[in-house]
Amino acid sequence: MYFALSVEIRREEGEFFSPIQGLYRRYELNYVFGDERDLIGVRTVMRPEDRVYMYRVNATPEQVQQLFRSIADRTNQLVEHPEFYHTLLNNCLNGILRHTVELTPEEVSWFDPQILLPGFSDRYAFNSGIIGQPGQTFEDLKEVSRIDERAEEVGIGDDFSKTIRGLPLTAVENQKVEE
């Protein structure tokens, strides 16, 4: 089982997200933790119209531990001092990016359109060296990192994490899938 994090708004009953309303302190910022099947499975299997990508972060085990501590500290900070979500300045992308800036020597320009507009965040991470391998193009990385089609094929089962990573199933696991 893998741990997953989603930075999002805390919606109240009957409340719907609006990017315009997100500019005006309408929503509280929320860190949601869960199993990959809960957080990623919803976006891949339950919303088949969404394209979902999973990128491996270029980090040492020590950096991963530091990243986890940073996320835990930030979560505790939000419990003590809640903040509002802001469509441009305190959103799902830059909430996570704040934790990854220590993985790259580059100075982060928080007003870069690739940071302000989440649809370009993967390119920013690639250009910063946070994701991708030497000699790999962004287009190639994006193609091999797309997971929604694999996830939709198998559904949200016990093998979900292996499937979205493209790992081969063992003979026993394959037999379970065929049954």
Walk through the language-model features, giving the residues of each.
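Soluble catalytic domains of enzymes that build or remodel membrane lipids, polysaccharides, and related
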Residues: 32-102
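Activation targets extended, charge/polar-rich intrinsically disordered C-terminal tails
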Residues: 72-179
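Glycine-rich catalytic cores of cysteine/serine-nucleophile enzymes that process amide/ester linkages
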Residues: 1-52
